[in-house]
């Protein structure tokens, strides 16, 4: 193995070397010096090249390369970047908690933001915790513990300032880390972002303590229709097209075509990638099917009894599908409707509270939302949770594609889902 570049940080100090196109810290190389042909360790413990190497800046070489690789695999330009930049520029910003359902691109967008706007990025995934971030928490969250963590993770030396960002992913996996957010905020000066897929469960779990006054929030969704049009270079057309029929027919046809595709496949990034690559709706549904199976498998882990799992499966698999076919004349409360539907599809004796538990989980997971009704348009007379909607048009289209639903009902439900999510 051969080192090709010496890497300097923003202060001019050596941060490490590029070996076989990969960055390695000086500490890591010292422990593995015998494996690098053109580097030696002096008596003073300094790494020296046998022949002078060209120097590169850490941020320029490492971060820009990482950013470029992410953009190559995830080229969509998302609106959440504006929210993240607004948070960063706020001089009094707090710890940011980025919320949203599974597979919408939260981690990807955070990485884009971090590698583009910071010199040092510390990325922690609590589902694996490969380098024992929990030790940082147990030992006081101080800068020395972060330096030790960075060495374990083969990252550059910890720089405790606003040029460093700490991203803690899947934070719902550890109540200890979540409960230490305030301590982290008070102990270090770098920017901190936490995120996860099922953060709603934290609200109802006694193990998690809400760090009031320490967190600000941002919420991310699947791609909106405007973001979807951006993928196909039609966002400007969407913004400027004449709403009174005075534009060219070609422009209306182009937008209508994108709209019809969006109603079918929705806004999950991986689904849109598949459509861009293949143009095949059925292949897109294959991705949605896998997303839903993953969600169901992960959701079952949060129900403690077999009975709860069966009720959840019925609420998810049967009742919610049938809700897509609910007639406009049916004006029961969502829970009343679901309870009736679940009772008809299971041998269990089910009560409204048990169904409410399953629905609450679906809402926390970002799969389902409920909408209130202003009776006769009177904002003083609100009927709570009158109707439920899925968070993505593609999910509705996929589920209804597998059921015997009238085309008129199907079109109406998907259109309502589109409008609800655009307004929401």
Task: Explain the meaning of each model-derived region.
Residues 277, 283-424:
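Accessory nucleic acid-recognition modules appended to NTPase machines
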Residues 98:
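Hydrophobic anchor at the beta1->P-loop junction of P-loop NTPases
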Residues 128-157:
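Short glycine-rich substrate-engagement loop in P-loop NTPases that contacts/grips substrate
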């Amino acid at each position: 193995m051969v080192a090709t570049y010496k890497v300097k940080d923003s202060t001019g100090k050596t941060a490490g070397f590029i070996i076989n196109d990969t960055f390695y810290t000086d500490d890591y190389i010292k422990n593995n010096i015998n494996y690098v042909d053109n580097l030696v360790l002096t008596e003073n413990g300094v790494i020296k090249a046998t022949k002078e190497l060209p120097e590169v800046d850490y941020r320029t070489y490492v971060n820009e390369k990482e950013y470029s690789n992410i953009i190559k695999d995830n080229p969509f330009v998302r609106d959440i970047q504006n929210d993240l930049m607004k948070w960063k520029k706020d001089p009094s910003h707090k710890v940011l908690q980025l919320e949203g359902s599974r597979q919408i691109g939260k981690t990807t967008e955070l990485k884009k933001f971090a590698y583009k706007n910071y010199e040092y990025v510390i990325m922690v995934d609590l589902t694996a915790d490969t380098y024992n971030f929990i030790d940082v928490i147990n030992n006081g969250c101080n800068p020395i513990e972060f330096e030790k963590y960075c060495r374990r993770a083969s990252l550059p030396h910890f720089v405790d300032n606003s040029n460093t960002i700490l991203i803690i992913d899947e934070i719902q996996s550890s109540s200890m880390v979540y409960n230490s957010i305030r301590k982290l905020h008070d102990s270090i000066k770098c920017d901190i972002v936490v995120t996860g897929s099922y953060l709603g469960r934290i609200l109802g779990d006694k193990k998690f303590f809400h760090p009031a006054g320490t967190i600000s929030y941002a919420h991310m969704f699947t791609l909106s229709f405007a973001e979807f049009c951006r993928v196909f270079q039609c966002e400007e057309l969407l913004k400027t097209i004449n709403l009174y029929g005075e534009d060219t027919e070609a422009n209306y046809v182009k937008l209508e075509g994108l709209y019809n595709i969006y109603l079918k496949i929705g806004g999950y990034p991986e689904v849109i990638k598949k459509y861009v690559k293949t143009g095949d709706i059925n292949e897109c549904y294959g991705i949605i099917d896998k997303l839903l199976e993953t969600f169901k498998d992960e959701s079952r882990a949060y129900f403690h009894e077999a009975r709860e799992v069966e009720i959840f499966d019925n609420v998810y698999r049967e009742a919610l599908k049938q809700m897509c076919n609910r007639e406009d004349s049916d004006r029961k409360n969502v829970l009343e409707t679901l309870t009736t539907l679940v009772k008809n599809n299971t041998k269990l004796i089910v009560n409204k509270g048990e169904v409410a538990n399953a629905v609450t989980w679906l809402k926390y997971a970002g799969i389902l939302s409920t909408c209130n009704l202003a009776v006769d348009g009177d904002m003083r007379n609100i009927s709570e949770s009158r109707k439920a909607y899925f968070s993505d048009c593609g999910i509705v289209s996929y589920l209804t594609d597998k059921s015997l639903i009238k085309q008129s009902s199907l079109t109406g439900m998907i259109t309502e889902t589109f409008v609800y999510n655009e307004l929401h």
